[in-house]
A protein has these predicted regions:
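Terminal, regulation- and interaction-focused segments at domain boundaries
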Residues: 42-71, 76-78, 170, 174
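Compact, glycine-rich, soluble single-domain proteins
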Residues: 79-123
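N-terminal secretory signal peptides that target proteins for export/translocation
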Residues: 1-24
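Sec-dependent N-terminal signal peptides
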Residues: 29-35
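Short, ordered beta-strand-loop transition motifs
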Residues: 43, 78, 95-96, 133-136
Length: 176
């Protein structure tokens, strides 16, 4: 028996209003799926290149040379492993044999990026990490955070970082 009061109650249930199961609105389900998609893409923005048959000092020198050969000036070199050792939070076990971050910027690229969108100033300076892990100090890793390719400036930044890392890896393997 279908009463008028029951019909009104059924119409007020969100699964009836929005046509989705379990009372979840379509908006909520779309929002949840977009959140999951954006979270997984955040984890994939680090690019790592491994270099074998070299040593940290040679790879460091190769990275400096690769940056300077692009006509760029290094802003700073951050001794990341040393900073972690000094602050020794937790059990004190460090994952790095050696680790540093080299920061640099291209004035032309920075100008292009901020013309595209003022908030893109957060992409400067660019940085490349150079490190070894405790369990394998003979393998040097070069890593950077990809700026993505959503604008022409970001594409140029990505291309610049790729060129620098590839050139640094080549120089490190040469042990020049």
């Amino acid at each position: 028996m279908n009463r008028p009061g029951n019909e009104l109650l059924r119409q007020m249930v969100s699964s009836h209003l929005f046509g989705t199961p379990c009372g979840a609105s379509r908006f909520f389900l779309v929002f949840l799926s977009l959140l999951c998609i954006s979270t997984s893409s955040i984890a994939d923005d680090t690019v790592v290149v491994r270099v074998s048959n070299s040593d940290f000092r040679t790879a460091h020198d190769g990275l400096i040379e690769a940056i300077e050969s692009e006509g760029l000036v290094i802003g700073s070199i951050l001794p990341f492993r040393d900073m972690l050792a000094r602050t020794a939070v937790g059990d004190g076990a460090l994952p790095y044999g050696e680790a540093e971050i080299v920061q640099f910027c291209s004035a032309l690229l920075a100008a292009e990026l901020v013309r595209e969108a003022p908030a893109q100033l957060t992409l400067c300076p660019l940085s490349i990490a150079l490190y070894t892990q405790v369990e394998n100090t003979s393998e040097i890793r070069l890593a950077y955070r990809s700026p993505g390719n959503s604008t022409a400036g970001r594409q140029r930044a990505e291309s610049l970082l790729q060129r620098i890392v590839q050139r640094a890896a080549e120089l490190a393997r040469l042990r020049w």
